[in-house]
């Protein structure tokens, strides 16, 4: 079984799997050593770790280089947050996916949000057509990549987020995509409604108020992501250590 097949299978288990969200080779090694079944980039974390703001500000070539380093180092399935695709044209997105798949990436997230200073949802029908073109191409060329559509109504705080999300999912599940990612959703009632609206596996993300993993499993969620929260906590803790060394005038805080 190759990594694509392993990754696909993870989405069919009764209990959701936890995705370790990485930003470099060291973080990838850390999650793999801890026993995680799969890893994936956080767009926020990988951008911040390299000195960029989120929202496709980090160059695609940098992401591709890091992806290659990761797949050469860890053996578990690796998926990548491609944001809106790093291209304004479908052909360009397809080329980017081919390049990533060529270095061993077996999944991508692609979002229905315009990557701009004021983020907003794209037209659902147009976006669905774009994804259909991508999945048709991948199927014809034998490219094994898990396409996870991220839909951002909850993340953007849209008033009718649940209705928007379900309406969009109905269009997106016809595209040939493999899964749906709904970051920002936390209500058990909303999560249950989204899960019940589609046959595709639902992915949720760490947020204040998100139910525990057992509850999410009971609701039918198949995949849980960390987003940038793990990265933020790592560097929050590191900042405290840096202050301790400076204030204590010794290294006791980092050698014990």
Language-model segments: which ranges?
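Conserved alpha/beta catalytic core and glycan-binding cleft of carbohydrate-active enzymes
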Residues: 226-256
